[in-house]
Amino acid sequence: MIVDTGSNYLTAQSIFGYAHSIKSDNSCKVVNTELHFDHIGGNCFFRAKNIDIHAHPGTQRTPDEFLANKKEFNDTIPDPIRRSKNESDAFFLKTDLENPNRSIAPGNTFDLGGVNVDVIASPGHTRFNLSFFAKSDGVLFSGDCIVSHYLPYLGAVDISAWEVWLQSLDRIEDLHPKAIVPGHGDIIKTSEIGKELDRMRKILTDAINDTNRDNL
């Protein structure tokens, strides 16, 4: 199972290469945890190979949003000459928008041939975030519901979604994972899970409290 396809075609090509090198005759099951382009940008590589992409039905973007993402990326290039030449085109080489073509929902299970992976609702970072839990191994792929060391991005949603996000963290903790593969950052080992979840909770709680104070 490949969880998220990276930002672009070339990233997805590398991910596929690693997966293929482990066991070349394995079929690929590909899932997206969310709709942000750093998670779905490489979908085009897999769809070109006729490999299905599974995700929440809300994981859909428009061509205009994809073009805006490319422009935003280009605008972050510090060098004005490189920026004026649209150097981001190199980053997005061969990359086209491909939305997931197979819908999944919390409660679904993937049978990977001896390992079952459960689909877990983990909204908050976006309203449609999913996580994936291989219970027999105790490994949870959290997407951006959890990031280690990084600060989570809160700007895609509002305070009501942050409160839902806290519930998602509780749901994940109740699964008692042995390891968490976050959306960004290092793999979180058993001994670090409680600390990382508490760090995420504090960031979200502080943001909620600050917003409530501003609204008084």
Spans of features found by a protein language model:
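Divalent-metal (often Zn2+) His-rich catalytic cores of metallo-beta-lactamase-fold enzymes
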Residues: 49-52, 133, 139, 161-215
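Core dinuclear metal-dependent hydrolase active-site scaffold
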Residues: 103-134, 139
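Acidic/histidine-rich helix-loop elements
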Residues: 65, 71-72, 150-160
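Short, solvent-exposed loop/turn segments at secondary-structure boundaries
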Residues: 6-7, 153-157, 191-195
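Active-site HxH/HxHxD metal-binding segment of metal-dependent hydrolases
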Residues: 10-13, 17-105, 109, 202-209
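Active-site environment of divalent metal-dependent phosphoester hydrolases
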Residues: 9-10, 35-41, 60-64, 126-129, ...
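Active-site neighborhood of phospho(di)ester-bond hydrolases with catalytic His/Asp-centered motifs
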Residues: 3-6, 27-36, 54-57, 121-123, ...
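Conserved beta-strand hairpin/beta-sheet module of binuclear metal-dependent hydrolase folds
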Residues: 1-23, 131-144
